[in-house]
From Swiss-Prot:
Belongs to the phosphoglycerate mutase family. Ais subfamily. The lineage of its organism: Bacteria, Pseudomonadati, Pseudomonadota, Gammaproteobacteria, Enterobacterales. CDD domains: HP. The keyword Manganese does not apply. This is Lipopolysaccharide core heptose(II)-phosphate phosphatase. The gene is ais. GO terms for biological process: lipopolysaccharide metabolic process. It is found in: Periplasm. It is an enzyme of class 3 (hydrolase). It comes from Escherichia coli (strain SMS-3-5 / SECEC).
């Protein structure tokens, strides 16, 4: 019982820190909460959160070639040239505040290409489990985090995965655009959704 209370207090303390950081971020972004009810977490706020817990950031892949009139990078099942530019820009901004992270993607061309352009040379691990978007994705996240408990993790996955997580964890309706993301962390074997990543 005592252990449970301590764990509960720790989780509440972390959530209070998150709220405070989101409020601070809101002073600069004009809104600490998204219209869907998720806390907005920008790069600076994410860096502060990473000092409390290693973070897990899940991104939707960049612009799909087969659903755009923009020029394809190569394979039609991959992303567009614009998508590569957007992914590189996001990666540069992200790495400026979170330089140390392990990088993963699902086993599709579009997520692999997105992660590759995001990372600018960082080692990428492809994991087919990250294509499955039910409770299975939580098991995959916990497994990846357990391999390097002190490392931040970036995962490139799919819109339906992010939509599922937001609904399941916070009953929020989240319809991610290309390269939108969610911020999570793992604590004592449980996966928590902290908020929506906002790139500023």
């Amino acid at each position: 019982m005592l252990a449970f209370c301590r764990s509960s207090l720790k989780s509440k303390k972390y959530f209070i820190i998150l709220l405070a950081l989101a409020a601070i971020a809101g002073l600069g972004t004009h809104a600490a909460w998204s219209s869907n009810g998720l806390p907005r977490i920008d790069n600076k706020t994410l860096a502060r959160l990473a000092q409390q817990h290693p973070v897990v950031v899940l991104f939707r892949h960049a612009e799909r070639c087969d659903r755009s009139t923009n020029q394809c990078l190569s394979d039609k099942t991959g992303i567009t040239v614009k998508g590569t530019q957007d992914a590189r820009e996001l990666g540069n901004a992200f790495s400026a505040d979170i330089p140390d992270f392990d990088l993963y993607s699902s086993n599709t061309v579009r997520t692999i290409q997105s992660a590759t352009w995001f990372s600018a040379g960082k080692k990428l691990t492809v994991d087919k489990r990250l294509l499955q978007c039910g409770n299975e994705i939580y098991s995959a996240i916990k497994d990846l985090q357990s391999k390097a408990p002190d490392k931040n993790i970036v995962i490139f996955t799919h819109n339906h995965c992010l939509t599922y997580i937001a609904k399941d964890k916070r009953d929020a309706t989240f319809k991610p655009d290309y390269l939108d993301g969610l911020v999570m962390h793992v604590e004592k074997g449980k996966v928590y959704l902290d908020g929506e990543f906002v790139n500023h």
